[in-house]
Amino acid sequence: MNIPTLDDLNFSNSKVLVRIDINSPVDSKTGKLLDDSRIKAHVETIRELVSRGNGVVLVSHQGRPGDNDFTDLEEHSRLLQKHLDMEVEFVGDVMGPYARERIRNMKLGSVLLLDNVRFVSEELIEASPLQHSRSFLVRRLQPLFQGYVNDAFATAHRSQASLVGFPLVLRSSAGRVMEKEVSALAKVFNEGEEPKVFIMGGGKVLDSLRIIENLVKRRLADRILTGGLIAELFAVAKGLDLGKDNLQVLEKAGVLSLVPRARKLLLSGAPVEIPVDFKVEKGGQVYEEPANKVTAVIKDVGSTTVGIYSSFIRDAKIIVMRGPMGVIEDERFRESSRTLLKNSLESPGYLIVGGGHMISLLGGIGPLDSSKVHVSTGGGALLLFLAGERLPALEALDISAREVLKK
């Protein structure tokens, strides 16, 4: 796949439409944004385009219709202005007469943010790049621009108009966020970067299982270290008796039906490591119990497991950590995840961290060496990338490179 970057397309003194992803958590009571990390992530791309004399028009979404976080982007524009240290004009329109008039009249070297693109019903439709290239959104905005940049890796798994329609009608490239994500994650699939260790935790069992199946099928993983609910699923698949309480947890999560798939992986010789001990809570006290003698609801992996997992991490060249080992909302069950994260950072290997819970743990660890660590902005896109699924936004940029840039 050929994904053009800003180095390949030297946009200058032009008007450029930039798809970013500044979808952020919103306080349900106040309506205020709770985190601006995604907003800060796009500053590099925007500044670079502005420094080349371009007029930069930003388009993004926030939430989905019917959800509490489905809002306009006015507050986002203020935060963008703060982090860019320059004026960002907010336009309370997406493709109507007012938006088009503001784009036509904007000065080169300035930045304009359109309103929530999901206010446009077409944006909610999943369709092919060709179909979206004929949408009203694309047809109305395309004549106003000389180029398009997609910097929204976190939404790359969506096949929506603002993500896949414009590359078919405009010279298009990836932005710096998109470029860094693809470059970092490509290391997962590169030969000669062994051993590769994947640390899979959290509560999204089906997603984790799909990723593990793809890693095993493509022989990409030397070790897969499990924690969270996916570890419990594999423990049951191995025949360990986790007790009635933990079976009920898996049943309530609707994942007991996945046990045969996990068992098939184990029987195939897949390099899946299962915890040898767990932390449980009884009467307000925390205890560590062997994996085959668990007497209460599992809250975390045990210290012996952390020691075993750390030995694999020390020798790894690539480490991918997705999801916590335990219930990290409770400080008592945060240590295993924090220790494995700390050991990964101290290892000589390259670390890729994904998932909101793991990223939140990074905050208390200190400054990160960007040459050794990549913090992924992708949620669903990261999962699908690791599971070997297609990412429509990347495919659209590839089509643009083959069909639009050569015209």
Curated annotation (Swiss-Prot):
* Reaction catalysis annotation: (2R)-3-phosphoglycerate + ATP = (2R)-3-phospho-glyceroyl phosphate + ADP
Query: Which InterPro entries does the annotation name?
Result: Phosphoglycerate_kinase (IPR001576), Phosphoglycerate_kinase_CS (IPR015911), Phosphoglycerate_kinase_N (IPR015824), Phosphoglycerate_kinase_sf (IPR036043)
Q: Which terms are listed as keywords in the entry? A: ATP-binding, Cytoplasm, Glycolysis, Kinase, Nucleotide-binding, Transferase
State any GO CC term. Answer: cytosol
Q: What EC identifiers does the entry list?
A: 2.7.2.3
The keyword Cytoplasm appears for this protein: yes
Cited Pfam families: PGK
**Pathway as given in its UniProt record:** Carbohydrate degradation; glycolysis; pyruvate from D-glyceraldehyde 3-phosphate: step 2/5
- What GO MF terms are annotated? ADP binding; ATP binding; phosphoglycerate kinase activity
Chief site of localization? cytoplasm
Residues noted as binding substrate in the record, renumbered to the chain: 21-23, 38, 61-64, 118, 158
Q: Where in the cell is it found?
A: Cytoplasm
Kindly indicate whether the keyword Zinc-finger belongs to this entry: no
Q: Name one GO biological process term.
A: glycolytic process
Q: Which residues bind ATP?
A: 329, 355-358
Entry similarity comment: Belongs to the phosphoglycerate kinase family.
Assembly and binders:
Monomer.
According to UniProt, the name of this protein is Phosphoglycerate kinase
The source organism is Metallosphaera sedula (strain ATCC 51363 / DSM 5348 / JCM 9185 / NBRC 15509 / TH2)
